[in-house]
UniProtKB/Swiss-Prot annotation:
Keywords: Disulfide bond, Hydroxylation, Ion channel impairing toxin, Nematocyst, Neurotoxin, Secreted, Toxin, Voltage-gated sodium channel impairing toxin. GO terms for cellular component: extracellular region; nematocyst. The lineage of its organism: Eukaryota, Metazoa, Cnidaria, Anthozoa, Hexacorallia. Signal peptide: none annotated. It comes from Condylactis gigantea (Giant Caribbean anemone). The keyword GTP-binding does not apply. This is Delta-actitoxin-Cgg1a. Belongs to the sea anemone sodium channel inhibitory toxin family. Type I subfamily. SUPFAM superfamilies: Defensin-like. Slows down the inactivation process of TTX-sensitive voltage-gated sodium channels (Nav). Has a strong crab-paralyzing activity. The minimum lethal dose against crabs is 7.9 mg/kg.
Length: 47
């Protein structure tokens, strides 16, 4: 999947580890949204 930034990854600075995965729509079952950013198209999720 496409990596995305979770709040736990720290500020959005080039070189940071991106520990989330983009899910179109909303997170899959067993995953949780891992940041506060609101996007109607996708959520950044973590297992």
């Amino acid at each position: 999947g496409v990596p995305c930034r979770c709040d736990s990854d720290g500020p959005s600075v080039h070189g940071n580890t991106l520990s989330g995965t983009v899910w179109v729509g909303s997170c899959a079952s067993g995953w949780h949204k891992c940041n506060d950013e609101y996007n109607i198209a996708y959520e950044c999720c973590k297992e």
